[in-house]
């Protein structure tokens, strides 16, 4: 019959168990079984600790045998790493990692080094006072420090040189890679630390702008020679440089400009929405006025279940939704949107009112037009001065009142004739009264 040891992670609530044969299991074997069962990995990045749930005492001895039917608490914490000079030189990072759970995965128990105790004289503490014991403690520490200094003086010093400075120095040696540019002078044949202008205190950099934050679709490549251009010319042409070392200029965003123009046109089209606002029409009848908006009724609807008053459709729907379907006029509840009935007769009255307003508005505009413009509108063909002998109806008679147009006689085209090469062109009479005042032949 197999034995069982119950365990539970400190951050969990459920309890698991490990099955084994025997009366007990060592701490080393228990940790290895827990790591394998929970698939915790190779153990290089954490350390596993086991505690007694009653006394919260850690089982730190791997050889300690835990009896069967025992419950333990398991805690996983980050590994403690300590790098030494020898581990860096050898390149063995795993050997430098201390305090992890690797040995439980590989099956190698922990090997403890024997500490070399220095020969110290232990004074007989029996029968001594507290001051004598303190003095003896300080004397022991001084002896240990002197022995440590003697060992350090005989040890061979090991010097470690950082590899980062060496690599960075080697990277900037030799010719620069393709695409590199010195941002001080604009040259591409040297590193910026080797720029010949570093020793010139009067040198002013070209101040080449970079394209940070600008999308590539708004950049256009150009070919220039930075050695032959002054900083003022580059700033005037707004030349920038990319990460690849290419010179570019910024182009306009046509798409955004077109979108702006389109939105502007839409706003102008939406200007017709002002006819539904309050105060747009000064002579608006009360029966065509919306009780909610105070303006002209727009898509008039009625509340069939209560007061049966006309409202604008959109305004009434918004008011019902915001007030939990309560009529804004008579405060009747449960007025649903499906109960709204369109008022066709009222909509026709609204259309008739708008047509009258358009006619009045159009007539007021026509009344402000000059007399010459009215004549051109009434006689767009320009046939008033084709022939002096031809009596054509004019748009304005001697009294100044307009007369209805009369059909032209048969054979006369409705447009002015072009002069023939063998006949001189006739003078165009702009004033219709001149035709009456001219002498008849």
UniProtKB/Swiss-Prot annotation:
Q: Name one GO molecular function term.
A: zinc ion binding
What are the DWNN domain coordinates in residue numbering? 5-78
Q: Compositional bias of type Polar residues: which residue ranges?
A: 384-400
Q: Where is the composition biased (Basic and acidic residues)?
A: 355-364
At the top level of its lineage, which domain of life is listed? Eukaryota
Q: What are the boundaries of the region Disordered?
A: 355-400
Matching entries from InterPro entries are given as:
DWNN_domain (IPR014891), RBBP6 (IPR033489), Znf_CCHC (IPR001878), Znf_CCHC_sf (IPR036875), Znf_RING/FYVE/PHD (IPR013083)
| Alphabetized Pfam families for the sequence | DWNN
Q: Which GO terms describe its cellular component?
A: cytosol; mRNA cleavage and polyadenylation specificity factor complex; nucleus
> Which coarse location class applies to the principal site listed for this UniProt protein?
nucleus
Zn finger (CCHC-type) start-end: 180-197
Question: Where, per UniProt, does this protein localize?
Answer: Nucleus
Assembly and partners are described as: Component of the cleavage and polyadenylation factor (CPF) complex, which is composed of PTI1, SYC1, SSU72, GLC7, MPE1, REF2, PFS2, PTA1, YSH1/BRR5, SWD2, CFT2/YDH1, YTH1, CFT1/YHH1, FIP1 and PAP1.
Additional facts recorded: Present with 1130 molecules/cell in log phase SD medium.
Kindly provide the name given to this protein in its UniProt entry.
Answer: Protein MPE1
Naturally occurring in which organism (per UniProt): Saccharomyces cerevisiae (strain ATCC 204508 / S288c) (Baker's yeast)
